[in-house]
Amino acid sequence: MEKTQAKPLTAAQQRQRDKKRRTWLRAGVQLFFFVSMPGAFVAGFSGVKQLFLHIGAGEVLSADSFTLSLLGLCGFTLLFDRFFCGYACAFGSLGDAVWALSGLVQKKLFHRKKQFRLPERAVLWGQKVKYLLLAGLVALYVTRQEKLLTGASPWEVFSRLTALRLPPEGFGVGIALLVLILLGMAVQPRFFCQFLCPMGAAFALLPVLPFARLHRQSEGCIPGCNACKQQCPVCLKLEESSLRSGECIACEACVGTCPKQNIHRWDMALCKHLWLPVLGKALLFFLLGCWLGFCRFI
């Protein structure tokens, strides 16, 4: 008796299979980093705190573990885009898990076919908040007023919980903020990353090498498709010269959903228009470093 050969997969079925594989692979990588280095985000931001505390005091920056963590994360981001945000940040992975659980609850209990999320206009405005938050924190650190934040840090509460330690007394505000952030994660993908993450704001400002970013070959796209934007947690439609490209968290959700496979990384031909803004950012950081160094001798 002859065996019937399995029918070859259609292009749509193959894309769906590849998308599932990519999703499970990313989840595995996120779980690995969540278990192995849950405190990387807190360590990196503690480096930001140490940097501006030393600047405010007019002291030479010490090469402690927090500073080295910050330099390592920034250097990695310059070379490989925001891979840390998309795959390795424990807080971001928590947001993905809460968002996935929220979708399951909405589907099973409330029979919603489409998961609720905030309107795009609200998202685009909300993304600006993290830059204001970063500026406010920097101002507090430079002026040596960091004690005003004692007990109010939600990521410090999260760091203690991942280390299986309860927050000490006096962290009521931080616990309340963490609960509110978790609720936000249920109604918007990457809620904290988009709206409140000061490290995300810092990473978005870095002059990432253009060929490390994701790029879309727009001339090969289906007119009116927008599949990449619909899947993007930060409402970003990839363009060759997007001014919002720093908001991309390198989760690669767009790569798996593109029906024409037009989204790529490490393609020099697609990023030739991005070198000028990158060099501009690099120059600004250089001038900032020179100014900070000059201020030490005034």
Whereabouts are the PLM-identified features?
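Non-ligating segments of multi-cofactor redox enzymes
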Residues: 1-230, 234, 238, 246, ...
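Short alpha-helical catalytic segment bearing the HExxH-like zincin motif
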Residues: 249
